[in-house]
Amino acid sequence: MQSSNSDIRNRKVVMICEDEQELLDLYSRVLELKYDVIKVCSGAECIHEYLEKKAKGSPIDLLFLDYKLGDMLGDDVAKKIKKMNGIKIILISAYNLDEPTKKELFENKYIEKFLQKPIRMRQIIQVAGEAI
């Protein structure tokens, strides 16, 4: 019994930033099987939540970040978080990013991986496991 409590306390934390509610709920249901999940639906909320958790000493281990959010682009969010000694970021998009943008994001280590929608749920679990 004690080890299971320890396992729960030591679960990794994954944040999902997705402005489409159905996808946000779907991704979180899959990831909640293995991780503690924080759901946000805008770039501003993502940055705010990251800063709040960091200030409380409750770091987020991985961020799944949609590229095209209602209030800003995912690459801008990724850059801001990485400049604050950020976390590992997986960028997700229904759009194929142009090569110069992808190259900049990878070369400057703003993101660890890029996933193109539609994404299979087992792919999300696999990518999360590889990243953290």
Give a label for each model feature:
Residues S42, L73-D76:
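Acidic catalytic/metal-coordinating carboxylates
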Residues Q21-K39:
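Two-component/phosphorelay signaling modules centered on CheY-like receiver
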Residues D66:
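Active-site residues of response regulator receiver
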Residues I92-A94:
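Hydrophobic/aromatic residues positioned on beta-strands within the core alpha/beta folds
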Residues C41-L62:
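Acidic, metal-coordinating helix/loop segments flanking the phosphotransfer/catalytic sites
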Residues D75-I87:
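Short amphipathic alpha-helix used as the core "switch/output" element in two-component signaling
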Residues G70:
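The feature encodes the CheY-like receiver
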Residues M1-M15, Q21, L51, R120-I132:
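Non-catalytic signal-transmission and effector/linker regions of two-component phosphorelay proteins
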